[in-house]
Swiss-Prot record:
It comes from Proteus mirabilis (strain HI4320). Belongs to the LysR transcriptional regulatory family. Residues 4-60 form the HTH lysR-type domain. The lineage of its organism: Bacteria, Pseudomonadati, Pseudomonadota, Gammaproteobacteria, Enterobacterales. This is HTH-type transcriptional regulator ArgP. The gene is argP. Controls the transcription of genes involved in arginine and lysine metabolism. Keywords: DNA-binding, Transcription, Transcription regulation. Homodimer. Residues 21-40 bind DNA. One of its GO terms (molecular function) is DNA-binding transcription factor activity. NCBIfam families: argP (TIGR03298), PRK03635.1 (NF002964), PRK13348.1 (NF009888). The keyword Lipoprotein does not apply. Pfam families: HTH_1, LysR_substrate. InterPro entries: ArgP, ArgP_gammaproteobact, LTTR, LysR_subst-bd, Tscrpt_reg_HTH_LysR, WH-like_DNA-bd_sf, WH_DNA-bd_sf.
Amino acid sequence: MKRPDYRALQALDAVIRERGFERAAQKLCITQSAVSQRIKQLENLFGQPLLVRTVPPQPTEQGQKLLALLHQVEMLEEQWLGDENSGSTPLLLSLAVNADSLATWLLPALHPVLTQLPIRLNIQVEDETRTQERLRRGEVVGAISIQPQALPSCLVDQLGALDYLFVASPDFAQRYFANGVTKSSLLKAPAVAFDHLDDMHQAFLQQNFGLSPGSVPCHIVNSSEAFVQLAKQGSTCCMIPHLQIADELKSGELIDLTPGLCQRRMLYWHRFAPESRTMRKVTDALLDYGRKVLKQDEE
């Protein structure tokens, strides 16, 4: 049986986390040459590349499996040695989450564990359709995703849903939708997407108005909070979680352009199995808070 050197695995992990050999070497307090040598030793042991040397570097399929193994071992070490290591460096938890969860409910949900446990968060923002892939690659130990099925050797629980409303400022609505929200008026109204793969706005318009993808003018802005600002200042119409704009809707600063219609995104919490004591507390915090603020199946 091939048994990897965990110092070499930590070097591989550092290169992926730090997005390069130089920063990985600084993080590990060794030379770049030493980082390269450790990874080369691993590759020789397994007889195949573990790293695609792109910018930034990416793990191969075998590299992903080894990173997942490392993270599971770290979780198990924390579980069995946590009390003895209570004064050591805080445990690093890398999580892949969607921007809207980060902007609304995630940080309040994590507040209890952040104040009670010695952990360091490494939050990686990704679309909820792609966060699970980061868990598959071993880049994170937990992910918030729309995928209901667990990966092999992983656990999954339903968190609840974010309901997205199609909103704009009253001024924007008057300029573009004075005669109602119609197919023709939507073709002229600028929208906004998080990135080029974010199709929520287009999917909503296609489903409810029959508009083909790509037919609406659309800004690209990588910030959930910026969506709210753009809508409030009358620059765009967009899909925003009700949870994020409840106050603006109540005050009339934003209006729901299509009352009765929403786009529901059910979210799931994925993580490696078995869970350590710390990870179990993170899971409990997310599930407890999610049940309070996110929409559940029966709602």
